[in-house]
Amino acid sequence: MGEKPAKFQPSGGKVRGVTGTYEHSIDAKGRLFIPAKLREELGVTFYLAMGVDACLAIYPQSTWDRFTEKFASLPMSQSKAMRPLFANAAKCELDSQGRIVIPQKLRKYAGLDKDVVIIGVHDRAEIWS
């Protein structure tokens, strides 16, 4: 039997997933408002990375730490599969107004211009154009 994956632990210590659908806009400086409910679930520091199907994934620190541990334990021959995830990721911290700056490279990858949808997907959120 395989090991069970760790459950997402928000800062309050209660086990729950990232949920909901939110429509917002990216401003001219590439900033995106993160809704209060998502901030509560994701924490103050999280990582933006290229997701599957041309979206951006927002990972809470705890999930990102699991990726890092897994990457470090892989043999060199298998670690190349995770290189793009780390090479294109950006550590994000919220500003005083609850916004993050999405780097241009990540906006271009996901085709993000102005209007976006943020959805909760269990242990992460995703940003879609």
Each language-model region and where it sits:
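Flexible "stalk/tail and boundary" regions
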Residues: M1-R31, K37-C92, S96-Q97, Q104-S129
